[in-house]
């Protein structure tokens, strides 16, 4: 997407940007935490050609059917256009994922974050978004009042909206969505437990959060050897249920095996696993992505596995970071063939 930002609960003109003052930007990581999936296709390749573009796209995304919707007063007539515009801007959920690819024009999707705050997403040609079933959202064109969209469906094309209220809250799709939001995050080695398995979603918060975790772990394990495995992998693509990164899908089993080896050597309570999900839209084509430029992570490609152990003679202090307390012993993109136990 071109941009995303928080907006107030009430807006005067839905077709304006309606940014907060000062502006509060959102991020792909915030959207990913709420279940939103985003991908951008080359706008020069995006079109409504059935055999040349749409059918191959459906196969790639594992969907079965589609339709093309052209929303504008010129196409629908002013009265019908405004009626649909009002309907689309009512906060609602669907019982199926809502998958949209912008072909022409532009518009705004408003979605609720995990704290029930509105985030506005500006979508332009080539932008594809998956709004998960059960998530409250709404849509509007911008002031151009013109957008052409490819709608993608698992089965027959349909658009059934359940406006926010008691009925929507009781739908299985809504309950399942909320359950997923509050469920422990899954990693390559099992569910996050806050003790030996962790997952940190936000790159810019990594150092602060991992420093707290590291200091606590070193205090708890002061009399026992400790190994920390950090696994950087592509985040989950909801259209497949797997990582968007094919190599990460293949590496998942090998990562689990290597971590089991660490557990066998250090003990299950002294082998620690941290998964860092990498959002496709933040990472691809971005040389300044935080994990790429981080002094320790130095991410060159995903997947990447690092194994660290406590640094000798490390001294804790108020401004000491996690990477001052740990030494990198193993760094690999080829998990299957790497010895993770050689930490000397």
UniProtKB/Swiss-Prot annotation:
Gene Ontology molecular functions: acireductone dioxygenase (Ni2+-requiring) activity; acireductone dioxygenase [iron(II)-requiring] activity; iron ion binding; nickel cation binding
This protein's GO CC annotations: cytoplasm; nucleus
Protein name as annotated: Acireductone dioxygenase
Annotated metabolic or biological route of this protein: Amino-acid biosynthesis; L-methionine biosynthesis via salvage pathway; L-methionine from S-methyl-5-thio-alpha-D-ribose 1-phosphate: step 5/6
Free-text function comment from the UniProt entry: Catalyzes 2 different reactions between oxygen and the acireductone 1,2-dihydroxy-3-keto-5-methylthiopentene (DHK-MTPene) depending upon the metal bound in the active site. Fe-containing acireductone dioxygenase (Fe-ARD) produces formate and 2-keto-4-methylthiobutyrate (KMTB), the alpha-ketoacid precursor of methionine in the methionine recycle pathway. Ni-containing acireductone dioxygenase (Ni-ARD) produces methylthiopropionate, carbon monoxide and formate, and does not lie on the methionine recycle pathway.
Location(s) in or outside the cell: Cytoplasm; Nucleus
EC category name: oxidoreductase
Family label: Belongs to the acireductone dioxygenase (ARD) family.
Pfam families to which the protein is assigned, alphabetical: ARD, TXD17-like_Trx
PANTHER family in UniProt: ACIREDUCTONE DIOXYGENASE
Key words, A-Z: Amino-acid biosynthesis, Cytoplasm, Dioxygenase, Iron, Metal-binding, Methionine biosynthesis, Nickel, Nucleus, Oxidoreductase
Species annotation: Leishmania major
Major subcellular location class: cytoplasm
Positions with a binding annotation for Fe(2+): 92, 94, 98, 137
Catalytic activity: 1,2-dihydroxy-5-(methylsulfanyl)pent-1-en-3-one + O2 = 4-methylsulfanyl-2-oxobutanoate + formate + 2 H(+); 1,2-dihydroxy-5-(methylsulfanyl)pent-1-en-3-one + O2 = 3-(methylsulfanyl)propanoate + CO + formate + 2 H(+)
């Amino acid at each position: 997407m071109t941009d995303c930002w928080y907006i107030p609960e009430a807006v005067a003109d839905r077709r304006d940007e309606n940014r907060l003052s000062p502006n509060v930007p959102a991020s792909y990581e915030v959207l990913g935490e709420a279940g939103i999936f985003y991908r951008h296709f080359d706008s020069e390749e995006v079109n409504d050609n059935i055999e040349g573009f749409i059918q191959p796209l459906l196969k790639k995304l594992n969907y079965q059917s589609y339709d093309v919707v052209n929303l504008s007063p010129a196409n629908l007539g002013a009265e019908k256009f405004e009626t649909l515009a009002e309907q689309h801007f009512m906060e609602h959920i669907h019982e199926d994922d809502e998958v949209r690819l912008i072909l022409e024009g532009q518009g705004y999707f408003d979605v609720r974050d995990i704290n029930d705050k509105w985030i506005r997403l500006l979508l332009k040609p080539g932008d594809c978004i998956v709004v998960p079933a059960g998530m409250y959202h709404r849509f509007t064109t911008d002031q151009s009042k013109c957008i052409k969209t490819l709608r993608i469906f698992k089965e027959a094309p349909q658009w059934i909206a359940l406006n926010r209220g008691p009925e929507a809250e009781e739908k299985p799709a809504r309950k399942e969505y909320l359950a997923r939001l509050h469920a422990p995050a899954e990693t390559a080695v099992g569910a996050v437990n806050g003790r030996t398995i962790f997952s940190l979603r936000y790159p810019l918060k990594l150092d602060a959060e991992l420093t707290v975790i590291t200091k606590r772990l070193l205090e708890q394990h002061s009399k026992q050897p400790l190994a920390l495995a950090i696994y950087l992998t592509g985040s989950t693509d909801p259209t497949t249920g797997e990582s968007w990164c094919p190599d990460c899908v293949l590496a998942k089993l090998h990562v689990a095996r290597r971590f089991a080896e660490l557990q066998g050597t250090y003990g299950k309570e002294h082998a620690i696993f941290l998964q860092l999900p990498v959002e496709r839209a933040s990472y691809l084509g971005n040389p300044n992505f935080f994990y790429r430029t981080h002094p320790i992570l130095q991410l060159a490609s995903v997947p990447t596995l690092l194994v660290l152990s406590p640094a000798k003679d490390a001294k804790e202090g108020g401004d000491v970071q996690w990477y001052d307390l740990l030494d990198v012993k193993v760094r690999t993109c080829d998990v299957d063939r790497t010895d993770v136990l050689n930490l000397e």
